[in-house]
């Protein structure tokens, strides 16, 4: 009986040590992402399902998407990703107010080869609000304000399209747009000022009204706040998965309940 009691106490002690370690790790993760609040995300699509026709939104908004056409699962920058055929492959996300934002950060990991490039390759698009794409010889993201297109060519494609993964990001705070690649600021544009246009429309990944994307896309996110260069450097290093997992999921409570049940 004493041996069993000692065993139970030892088991509880080991689990408490594990719980403490998990809590400490969670606190450190929280500090790392203190500036990137998951609650400010309109949608975070990690593409880590690896199979099926549904991509889950890891934000609290549940803006899940559906695969359409020529899309297949491949290895990504972090976990799994989607490869688009440039013909009819895309992801459709239903319209939701959480994707209609006043200020914005639009971010995605992309991988493509120069030989795959065509004008109007759209990475992310919500009509008539915002778009991340490349056109002609440049990366061409931007927002729509007052019915006016407020984007411009930012960076020669040859800098990026080397069949390697690159993080591209666009921000707009109501007065100026900024563009980043791999966590580094590349340029700004103050052509438009005011609120981003809003309309009831789906969000698409891999297509828009100017064409279909050819290549792979991983970890797409829309935030309703403006992130900065330090934030993008964190995402470049760690990806978006840790941001989506910052808050506890109840696993510690379940573990503690199981311990009590065993004793």
Regions of interest found by a model, annotated:
Residues 11, 17, 23-87, 187, ...:
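Extracytoplasmic low-complexity segments
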Residues 35-40, 73-77, 98-101, 161-162, ...:
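Extracellular/periplasmic catalytic domains that process cell-envelope and extracellular macromolecules
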Residues 48, 192-193:
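A generic structural motif
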Residues 38-42, 46, 51-58, 87-145, ...:
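Extracellular glycan-recognition modules
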Residues 94-96, 148-156, 187-190, 198-219:
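Extracellular glycan-interaction patches encoded by glycine-rich segments
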Residues 1-15:
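N-terminal secretory signal peptides that target proteins for export/translocation
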